[in-house]
Structure formats: C-alpha cells, structure tokens
Amino acid sequence: MLIVNTDFITDQRLQTLGIVHGVGLAFTRKGEISQAHEEMKKEASALGADAIINVRYTYGERGIFAAGTAVRFI
C-alpha cells in the first residue's frame, strides 16, 4: 500500500474513505514508524483503500503517532 505525506498522487483521481491512524511505541522491538505504518495499513485495508495520503507524524517521549487519509483510486 502506498503511503505518502502529500495530499495527492500524481495522475490519480482519488476517493476519500476516511482518517486512519497508527501508533509506534518506543519500548517495543519493532521500529516505531514501521509499527505505526502497519496499524494505518490495517485500518486503510479494512476501508478498501489503495493508499494513504497526507500522512503526518507526531513524535513523543514514548513513541510516534501517525495519521493520514485513506483513499481509493477511481
């Protein structure tokens, strides 16, 4: 699944499906960003998404919070 921090994908028309988010915890063995991406992908897949756009990250003492918009190509 494509994950980008822009609000568009070149040469693609998009249908917005909803906001998805993920959390990566600093004290786990898995990488924080990878963990957050995996959680977002699961939510987006459940919505039938092809990609997640406009992804934003918030870093904290205990990990990372990521949120973006799940979209379907039309």
Give the predicted meaning of each segment.
Residues 15-57:
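Short, well-ordered alpha-helical segments
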Residues 62-74:
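C-terminal edge-of-domain segments
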Residues 7-8, 55-59:
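Short, solvent-exposed loop/turn elements at beta->coil junctions and helix N-caps
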Residues 1-20:
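Compositionally biased P/S/T/G-rich terminal and signal peptide-adjacent segments
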